[in-house]
Amino acid sequence: MASVSELACIYSALILHDDEVTVTEDKINALIKAAGVNVEPFWPGLFAKALANVNIGSLICNVGAGGPAPAAGAAPAGGPAPSTAAAPAEEKKVEAKKEESEESDDDMGFGLFD
């Protein structure tokens, strides 16, 4: 879990990026001081140097895109390979369930202007 100091620097960097201002140590310090947060003096410089050559916008868009996920139909080691004919049938079942759930929401009486 991130400390308060780390979070203050992260939020400061995000605010600066949102305002399309370059992220520098002085600007991070100014935002932290304005927020009234006590931060160890090395954090703003560390974050400013770490984000100097990084496209923050692409970082935001790629959060959670860690690495390749294993295939959904992968067989356990030594087991038989799964049949490929079962995959389209499963997709049709999922689509049918989605359609049913969307239709059932209409009958709940949660309409805004009913």
UniProtKB/Swiss-Prot annotation:
Positions with biased composition (Basic and acidic residues): 89-100
Top-level lineage group: Eukaryota
Cellular component aspect of the GO annotation: cytoplasm; cytosol; cytosolic large ribosomal subunit; cytosolic ribosome; focal adhesion
Biased composition range(s): Low complexity: 69-88
Region (Disordered): 69-114
Annotated function: Plays an important role in the elongation step of protein synthesis.
PANTHER family named among the record's database cross-references: 60S ACIDIC RIBOSOMAL PROTEIN P1, LARGE RIBOSOMAL SUBUNIT PROTEIN P1
Family label: Belongs to the eukaryotic ribosomal protein P1/P2 family.
Oligomeric and partner information: Heterodimer with RPLP2 at the lateral ribosomal stalk of the large ribosomal subunit.
The protein, known as: Large ribosomal subunit protein P1
Species this chain originates from: Homo sapiens
